[in-house]
């Protein structure tokens, strides 16, 4: 009798995705981040659900309800800090996952890549709205500044912003709808993840060599299940170290001050994982230009497959492209640092140079490097 896991309609899908899936025999730890992202998403939905049981999305009680969670709810502080720091772990894994895709040329799987970009945008929107919910100073002013960027859209901008706010400023209506969206979007993300995997399993995974691995596949279980479990344990270890020893390390102290529309904090800045984009936004002295640059800083990923000039898929054997890739990583770290600095000399100049370099590497230098490497190899 055939095994039930291969016969049952539901078990069959799980079996073909996680058990009997033919996987390349040489995928490295950089391929762990997909499953780590799934772990992060599950953790965020679970901790978020328990937080939502105690949270109230009203301007008068939101801040107090978060305080109540931390002080009075059994292990509420653990749940709250796991959720807040879980978001940081989520974005670390996200950026590593995208970086892996860039380095090894996984963007040649265009459908998977494009769904990934949509996922990235959705997760960024979810995280932004989540940051508004505790209703501290940085929550309120972050929401005000970021939503206000939409007013740069010609003609409809102002109406659009007021429509999103549900009034003439960030207020009760804004907080309530942000909570509603913050609750629903992770489930949208889950659905998109399924589509992401559907497209991935149409082609199979890429691998570090960039060469087809059809002739050398191994079953996903037990080889990669055990590898993924090890990765997940390391992820949870790092997360719990953060939660237990320095839960506020990555947060902003201003968010422990209740939101006050009458007093602006000295430095309005988003969470650390948005600082690189915030730095690009601020480096352009024109409002609409800044907003476009902010959008393009992520949307540029969509045209990466079109800019691939090399005859090799990954960068494993392409030293010039490797140098540019790590320069890009360093540049993004510099932008992240700049995003958290005040708008004054020399930070403005450094931010502008780093922003120019970011777009130059992706749009100009990497395609040129691909052509040079082809010529060196006489291809």
From Swiss-Prot:
Kindly indicate whether the keyword Membrane belongs to this entry. Answer: yes
Which controlled-vocabulary keywords does the entry list? Electron transport, Heme, Iron, Membrane, Metal-binding, Mitochondrion, Mitochondrion inner membrane, Respiratory chain, Transmembrane, Transmembrane helix, Transport, Ubiquinone
Intracellular or extracellular location(s): Mitochondrion inner membrane
**So which cofactors does this thing need?**
heme b
Q: Which residues bind heme b b562?
A: 83, 182
Q: Name one GO molecular function term.
A: ubiquinol-cytochrome-c reductase activity
Against PANTHER family, the record matches this protein to: CYTOCHROME B
Q: What else is known?
A: Heme 1 (or BL or b562) is low-potential and absorbs at about 562 nm, and heme 2 (or BH or b566) is high-potential and absorbs at about 566 nm.
Q: What does this protein do?
A: Component of the ubiquinol-cytochrome c reductase complex (complex III or cytochrome b-c1 complex) that is part of the mitochondrial respiratory chain. The b-c1 complex mediates electron transfer from ubiquinol to cytochrome c. Contributes to the generation of a proton gradient across the mitochondrial membrane that is then used for ATP synthesis.
Name of the protein in its database record = Cytochrome b
Which organism does this sequence originate in?
A: Arctocephalus gazella (Antarctic fur seal)
* Gene it is expressed from: MT-CYB
């Amino acid at each position: 009798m055939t095994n039930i896991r291969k016969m049952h309609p539901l078990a069959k899908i799980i079996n073909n995705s996680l058990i009997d899936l033919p996987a390349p025999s040489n995928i490295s730890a950089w391929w762990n981040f997909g499953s780590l992202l799934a772990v992060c998403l599950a953790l965020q939905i679970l901790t978020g659900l328990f937080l939502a049981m105690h949270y109230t999305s009203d301007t008068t009680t939101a801040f107090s309800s978060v305080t109540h969670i931390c002080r009075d709810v059994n292990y509420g502080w653990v749940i709250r800090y796991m959720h807040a720091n879980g978001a940081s772990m989520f974005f670390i894994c996200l950026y590593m996952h995208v970086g892996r895709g860039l380095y090894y040329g996984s963007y040649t799987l265009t459908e998977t890549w494009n769904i990934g970009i949509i996922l990235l945008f959705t997760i960024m929107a979810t995280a932004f709205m989540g940051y508004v919910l505790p209703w501290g100073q940085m929550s309120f002013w972050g929401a005000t500044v970021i939503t206000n960027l939409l007013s740069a859209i010609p003609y409809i901008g102002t109406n659009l912003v007021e429509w999103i706010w549900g009034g003439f400023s960030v207020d009760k209506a804004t907080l309530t709808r942000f909570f509603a969206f913050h609750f629903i979007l992770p489930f949208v993300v889950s659905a998109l993840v399924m589509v992401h995997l559907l497209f991935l399993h149409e082609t199979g995974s890429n691998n570090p060599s960039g060469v087809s691995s059809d002739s050398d596949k191994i079953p996903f279980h037990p080889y990669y299940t055990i590898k993924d479990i090890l990765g997940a344990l390391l992820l949870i270890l790092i997360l719990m170290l953060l939660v237990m020893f320095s839960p506020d390390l990555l947060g902003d102290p201003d968010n422990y001050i209740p939101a006050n529309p009458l007093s602006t904090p000295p430095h309005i800045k988003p969470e650390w994982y948005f600082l690189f984009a915030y730095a690009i936004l601020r480096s352009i002295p024109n409002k609409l230009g800044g907003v476009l640059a902010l959008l393009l800083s992520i949307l540029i990923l969509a045209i990466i497959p079109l800019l691939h000039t090399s005859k090799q898929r990954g960068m494993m054997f392409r030293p010039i492209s490797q140098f540019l890739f790590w320069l890009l990583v360093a540049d993004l770290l510099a932008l992240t640092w700049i995003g958290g600095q005040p708008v004054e000399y020399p930070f403005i100049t450094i931010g502008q140079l780093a922003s120019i370099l970011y777009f130059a590497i992706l749009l100009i230098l990497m395609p040129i490097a691909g052509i040079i490497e082809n010529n060196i190899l006489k291809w």
